[in-house]
């Protein structure tokens, strides 16, 4: 019984590795979108942080 589970797991990992290489374009597009989101969040935080620190200074 354990051999069947191990064989199925190895087969599944092998299929994922083989099919993952053919879809590199899709993964690259996803990575670019995530990179763009990260840049937008970084720029927004650069704008918001001075405002927040000024607000905290007024509150003291």
Swiss-Prot record:
Keywords: Amidation, Antibiotic, Antimicrobial, Immunity, Innate immunity, Secreted, Signal. It comes from Aedes albopictus (Asian tiger mosquito). Belongs to the cecropin family. GO terms for cellular component: extracellular space. PANTHER family: CECROPIN-A1-RELATED. This is Cecropin-B type 1. Induction: By bacterial infection. GO terms for biological process: antibacterial humoral response; defense response to Gram-negative bacterium; defense response to Gram-positive bacterium; innate immune response. The modification Isoleucine amide is found at residue 58. It is found in: Secreted.
